Amino acid sequence: MGCFHSKAAKEFRGHEDPVKLASETAFSVSEVEALFELFKSISSSVVDDGLINKEEFQLALFKSRKRENIFANRIFDMFDVKRKGVIDFGDFVRSLNVFHPNASLEDKIDFTFRLYDMDCTGYIERQEVKQMLIALLCESEMKLADETIEIILDKTFEDADVNQDGKIDKLEWSDFVNKNPSLLKIMTLPYLRDITTTFPSFVFHSEVDEIAT
């Protein structure tokens, strides 16, 4: 194990230990190691400083650094846990953890609630849902008439806004998602597909596993 720790210490210098991150998330050590390779690739795409800025994040998601997108901005802001305008490796892994198949339903519901609550008011309001819906439709290259979008919004708030105060609180959102689990399809990160399939099934061979065998 000494050889691994010596090499790992050099490889991950300045970043959180993969074994520690694996113990705090649903990822295995091998998966964290693969995520580190991914992190290095993204964080050096514009400025090689060991951190992911918004431009690099945008480039990784949409292969374009010029395209402004509400969805990408919201995901970046939620990954930027320390609110420094950049994402370090620890935050990258912990943020991706919510998209892991073994992540709890409660965590996924909480993430999607915060994703839609763009103004951080503790409520999801109609305009926020509309903005996100339009952004997602744009990314999937789908077009809906304004009337259709308004019908979707009407139906959403009719079903989710139980107390009819014009906004959806955390409990209402949780109940709504539990009745409509398809809403969590966003948690498969379809718009991060190019990132998450860079290393299919995390095929990198872990040095920890190698030592263990």
UniProtKB/Swiss-Prot annotation:
The keyword Calcium applies. Changing S201A: Loss of phosphorylation. Keywords: Abscisic acid signaling pathway, Calcium, Cell membrane, Lipoprotein, Membrane, Metal-binding, Myristate, Palmitate, Phosphoprotein, Repeat, Stress response. Residues 31-66, 67-102, 104-139, 148-183 form the EF-hand domain. The record marks S140 as: Involved in dimerization. Induction: By light, drought, salt, cold and wounding. Up-regulated by glucose, but not by sucrose or fructose. Its main location: membrane. Disruption phenotype: No visible phenotypes when grown under normal conditions, but increased sensitivity to low temperature. Hypersensitivity to paclobutrazol and to drought, glucose and salt stresses. Ca(2+) 1 binds at D117, D119, T121, Y123, E128. It is a lipid-anchor. PROSITE patterns: EF_HAND_1 (PS00018), EF_HAND_2 (PS50222). InterPro entries: CNBL1-10 (IPR045198), EF-hand-dom_pair (IPR011992), EF_Hand_1_Ca_BS (IPR018247), EF_hand_dom (IPR002048). A lipid is attached at C3 (S-stearoyl cysteine). The modification Phosphoserine is found at S201. One of its GO terms (biological process) is response to cold. Acts as a calcium sensor involved in the signaling pathway during growth and development and in response to abiotic stresses. May function as a positive regulator of salt and drought responses and as a negative regulator of cold response. Contributes to the regulation of early stress-related CBF/DREB transcription factors. CBL proteins interact with CIPK serine-threonine protein kinases. Binding of a CBL protein to the regulatory NAF domain of a CIPK protein lead to the activation of the kinase in a calcium-dependent manner. Homodimer. Part of a K(+)-channel calcium-sensing kinase/phosphatase complex composed by a calcium sensor CBL (CBL1, CBL2, CBL3 or CBL9), a kinase CIPK (CIPK6, CIPK16 or CIPK23), a phosphatase PP2C (AIP1) and a K(+)-channel (AKT1). Interacts with PP2CA, CIPK1, CIPK6, CIPK7, CIPK8, CIPK11, CIPK15/PKS3, CIPK16, CIPK17, CIPK18, CIPK23, CIPK24 and CIPK26. Binds to PI4KB1 and to KINB1. Calcium binding of CBL1 is not required for membrane association and the endoplasmic reticulum-to-plasma membrane trafficking relies on a brefeldin A-insensitive pathway. Lipid modification is not required for interaction between CBL1 and CIPK1. This is Calcineurin B-like protein 1. The lineage of its organism: Eukaryota, Viridiplantae, Streptophyta, Embryophyta, Tracheophyta.
